[in-house]
């Protein structure tokens, strides 16, 4: 079976990860002790993708890492804390203190070997490992610094396996730490090179969804994580239940036209708050309409400001595949200016019969839009403002980093922005000119 190994790192990654396991355990009928109480064979058919079965109990293929014990203790004390394999909790005692260098070079580097041992052990218990998924944030120290260190180590050891990350990016207005722009830029520098698919999430977009759409007056991180997990559950549906787009590789092949442009926006419809049930069933056209809506995007970049290179939509529930295909065509024809014309039929749709808990139908959207450059631009501006004055740099250089590394990360991020811009402006006619430029770049 095509297994995925899930890794969660840092405070944010562990909280999202813990919630993700609650959601999919619920969907697969696995209770907090790991025994199965489901009602459908479909729940078990591909349960091996995420769970290891031993003597009738299902254990998540999850690895939890952090540089301080706090978050892990709360995961362990949480509703599904007993589900995880105790050896798979790997933690230090010092913490990274929101410092990327501590996570990547000093504290994290000391712990990384014990994490890799657990990764190897999980990978060996798989029949046919298809890849890794990592939940982490880019603004802190552990998830970003140690997370990217782990990604590059796994890349060395398993070069042909897909590496998919769910990365919580810094938000424009909601900032947790002052040095977020540094940590995020250094992380993106790594993710461009070492990850295959990066799903960009960000707290501000999630807060907006909570305020505007769900009308929650004071949303908590729990509510944000609920939204993230709804989307993660939707993206992984295809891997966990029978469907057409059934591997992470197929997803990557359909979504990534150029190797560096693998940062995706995620949308979900219908948006519901925790514990509320959907009172009226939505139709396929309504779902399609909603998932392309900028308000449904879980990342603070507006797709109307760019063009989609590619997109994938995963519908869940009982509906006609024909209707889904018609709607997809419809979207492309009506909004053709928002799709690049040099990739014909660039939306991939797939349908899975099993809806998420409490909904009749839902849909998850992954878009590779050039508008994602807004997010990188924003971080880059904040980065430059601080870096020009060398603010806070001593925390990083004190851990043995070099200023060169900051400069490289900055220029890599700016290159990424201009690549997105280049393809946004490209038309089908001038393709010839592009190829020559590309070849020139290759030669240089």
UniProtKB/Swiss-Prot annotation:
GO biological process terms, semicolon-separated: microtubule-based process
Residues that, per the record, bind GTP: 11, 68, 137, 141-143, 203, 225
Superkingdom, natural source: Eukaryota
Pfam families membership: Tubulin, Tubulin_C
Any one GO molecular-function label of the UniProt entry: metal ion binding
Stretches the record annotates as Disordered: 424-444
Family the entry assigns: Belongs to the tubulin family.
Name the record gives this protein: Tubulin beta chain
């Amino acid at each position: 079976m095509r297994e995925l190994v899930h890794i969660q790192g840092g405070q944010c990654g562990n909280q999202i990860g813990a919630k993700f396991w609650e959601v999919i355990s619920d969907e697969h009928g696995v209770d907090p002790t790991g025994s199965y109480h489901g009602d459908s064979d479909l729940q078990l058919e591909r349960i091996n993708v995420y769970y290891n079965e031993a003597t009738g109990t299902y254990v998540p293929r999850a690895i939890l890492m952090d540089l301080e014990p706090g978050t892990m203790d709360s995961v362990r004390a949480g509703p599904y804390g007993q589900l995880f394999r105790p050896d798979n909790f790997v933690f230090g005692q010092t913490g990274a203190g929101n410092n990327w260098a501590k996570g990547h070079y000093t504290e994290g580097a000391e712990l990384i070997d014990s994490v890799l041992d657990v990764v190897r052990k999980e990978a060996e218990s798989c029949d046919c490992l298809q890849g890794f998924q990592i939940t982490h944030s880019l603004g802190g120290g552990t998830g970003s610094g140690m997370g990217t260190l782990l990604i590059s180590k796994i890349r060395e050891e398993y070069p042909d396996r897909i590496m998919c990350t769910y990365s919580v990016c810094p938000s424009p207005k909601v900032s947790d730490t002052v040095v977020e722009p540094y940590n995020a830029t250094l992380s993106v520098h790594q993710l461009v090179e070492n990850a295959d698919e990066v799903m960009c999430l960000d707290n501000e977009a999630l807060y907006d969804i909570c305020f505007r759409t769900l009308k929650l007056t004071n949303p908590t991180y729990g509510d944000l994580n609920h939204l993230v997990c709804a989307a993660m559950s939707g993206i992984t549906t295809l891997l966990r239940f029978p469907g057409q787009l059934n591997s992470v590789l197929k997803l990557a092949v359909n979504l990534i036209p150029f190797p560096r442009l693998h940062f995706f926006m995620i949308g979900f419809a219908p948006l519901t708050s925790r514990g509320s049930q959907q009172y009226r069933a939505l139709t396929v056209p309504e779902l399609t309409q909603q998932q392309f809506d900028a308000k449904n995007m879980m990342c603070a970049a507006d797709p109307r400001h760019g063009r989609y290179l590619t997109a994938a939509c995963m519908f869940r529930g009982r509906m006609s595949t024909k209707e889904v295909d018609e709607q997809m065509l419809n979207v492309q024809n009506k909004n053709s200016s928002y799709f690049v014309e040099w990739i014909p039929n660039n939306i991939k749709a797939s349908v899975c019969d099993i809806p998420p808990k409490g909904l009749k139908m839902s849909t998850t959207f992954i878009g590779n839009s050039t508008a994602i450059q807004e997010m990188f631009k924003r971080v880059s501006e904040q980065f430059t403002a601080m870096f020009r004055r060398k603010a806070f740099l001593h925390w990083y250089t004190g851990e043995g980093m070099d200023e060169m590394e900051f400069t490289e990360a900055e220029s890599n991020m700016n290159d990424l922005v201009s690549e997105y811009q280049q393809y946004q402006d490209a038309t089908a006619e001038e393709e010839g000119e592009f190829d020559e430029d590309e070849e020139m770049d290759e030669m240089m």
